[in-house]
UniProtKB/Swiss-Prot annotation:
It comes from Picosynechococcus sp. (strain ATCC 27264 / PCC 7002 / PR-6). This is 4-hydroxy-3-methylbut-2-enyl diphosphate reductase. Binds 1 [4Fe-4S] cluster per subunit. GO terms for biological process: dimethylallyl diphosphate biosynthetic process; isopentenyl diphosphate biosynthetic process, methylerythritol 4-phosphate pathway; terpenoid biosynthetic process. It comes from the Bacteria. The active site is at 187 (proton donor). Pathway: Isoprenoid biosynthesis; dimethylallyl diphosphate biosynthesis; dimethylallyl diphosphate from (2E)-4-hydroxy-3-methylbutenyl diphosphate: step 1/1; Isoprenoid biosynthesis; isopentenyl diphosphate biosynthesis via DXP pathway; isopentenyl diphosphate from 1-deoxy-D-xylulose 5-phosphate: step 6/6. Keywords: 4Fe-4S, Iron, Iron-sulfur, Isoprene biosynthesis, Metal-binding, Oxidoreductase. Its cofactor is [4Fe-4S] cluster. The keyword Iron-sulfur applies. Dimethylallyl diphosphate binds at residues 96, 185, 317-319, 379.
Length: 403
């Protein structure tokens, strides 16, 4: 399928919207009321620090809603305003934040259900309005909705679209796209639908395995079994790794994506030599500014003498998980929560460890004075961060917190 031609055609459709509907000012007021926070602004104005009682909060200098997320949510709100009576769907969570998604449900926006691992579009009818979320949708989903005569509201983040353009360039020039990401993540699923031949790699360990295969060969079936579900149909590691271009899921760790790019560039240099490198490796620049800024701010934050760290964001949020990784790698006790509701009172917290299930921790706030770092993922509103910080202050002021 010529995905570029399809997108070009869709862009000219009278049923396709990407710029909003003229309700920007009204929606901005709603967004401010529902998602912004006077407490968080106070902390910003106080050099990102606030002390109350025995607790000093250190807030990361870049955190929370990124521009792409704010844009997507605002467009969803505008869509409801512009189509007050039409049935509105969103193909996935609009962003990875439960409070925002629940708010859309309150506005009578329907979410496409997943049945046996596949999205069920059977309830979507001609004339329905369908919102594509911030991390995009597959080209096949777009085609289905277009063929069904739906009104499509595309809130895909421009940084994600930039990655799609990169993999389409790879496809046009017969390069295999090496995509640094999680093959099940909605953004990577969408990105791979625009690619030709592709292989999704989670981390540098997997990249090193592929590098070794490129340079020294190996058992083809073992390779295919190792990366099952993470490559394009018909992918052959013996033929499809001679020409590669690197792209990424925008929420992955910047440093790891850069290392992966350098690793494959060096691999092709070793295999084909400096005179042939440009025919076998395509450079990239698809790292999202907002992701980078939040990670850089987190690296700065963990340099402080923190007693513990609280990372706030959806449990399925990739960018939030990577912020948590930074704290864990510095051996800072760190708690990933998705809302203030996870602070259960009596000095008990329900949190999600890296690569683990939600667990309950008692006496998580030690006695005495505490320095607590706080950050949040790109899909987390300031109001949610405020709720968490306020509950920490209240919890620490209670006798139970000192047990």
């Amino acid at each position: 399928m010529d995905t570029k031609a399809f997108k070009r055609s869709l862009n000219h459709s009278e049923n396709y919207y990407r710029q909003g509907f003229g309700h920007k000012d009204e929606v901005a007021g709603m967004m401010t009321s529902e998602y912004q926070s006077s407490l968080i602004q106070e902390i910003r104005d106080n050099n990102y620090e606030l002390t109350r009682g025995d607790v000093t909060i250190y807030l990361a200098e870049a955190f929370g809603f990124c521009w792409g997320v704010e844009r997507a949510v605002a467009m969803a709100y505008e869509t409801r305003k512009h189509f007050p009576t039409e049935k509105i769907w969103v193909t996935n969570e609009i962003i990875h934040n439960p409070s925002v998604n629940n708010r859309l449900k309150e506005m009578n926006v329907h979410f496409i259900e997943v049945v046996d691992g596949d999205k069920d579009f059977s309830g979507v009818a001609n004339g329905d309005v369908v919102i594509l979320p911030a991390f995009g949708a597959t080209v096949q989903e777009m085609q289905l909705l277009n063929d069904r005569g739906c009104t499509i509201v595309d809130t895909t983040c421009p940084w994600v679209s930039k990655v799609w353009n990169s993999v389409e360039k790879h496809k046009k020039k017969n390069y295999t796209s090496i995509i640094h990401g999680k093959y099940k993540h909605e953004e990577t699923v969408a990105t791979s639908s625009f690619a030709g031949t592709y292989l999704v790699l989670l981390n540098l360990e997997e990249a090193e395995y592929v590098r070794n295969y490129i340079l020294h060969g190996g058992d083809r079936q073992t390779f295919l079994d190792k990366f099952k579900n993470a490559y394009s149909e018909g992918f052959d590691p013996d033929k499809d790794l001679d020409r590669v271009g690197v792209a990424n899921q925008t929420t992955m760790l910047k440093s790891e994506t850069e290392q992966m790019g350098k690793l494959f560039e060096q691999t092709m240099l070793e295999k084909f030599g400096p005179t042939e490198i440009n025919d076998h490796f395509m450079s990239f620049n698809t790292i999202c500014d907002a992701t980078q800024e939040r990670q850089d701010a987190m690296f700065d934050l963990v340099e402080k003498d923190l007693d513990l760290m609280v990372v706030i964001g959806g449990f399925n949020s990739s960018n939030t998980t990577h912020l948590q990784e930074i704290a864990v790698e510095r051996n800072i006790p760190s708690y990933h929560i998705d809302s203030g509701d996870r602070l259960l009172g009596n000095n008990v917290i329900a949190h999600k460890p890296l690569d683990g299930e939600i667990t309950t921790q008692t006496h998580w706030l030690p006695a005495g004075k505490l320095k607590i770092g706080v950050t949040s993922g790109a899909s987390t509103p300031d109001k949610v961060v405020e709720d968490v910080i306020a509950k920490i202050f209240a919890e620490k002021a209670q006798p139970a917190a000192l047990v």
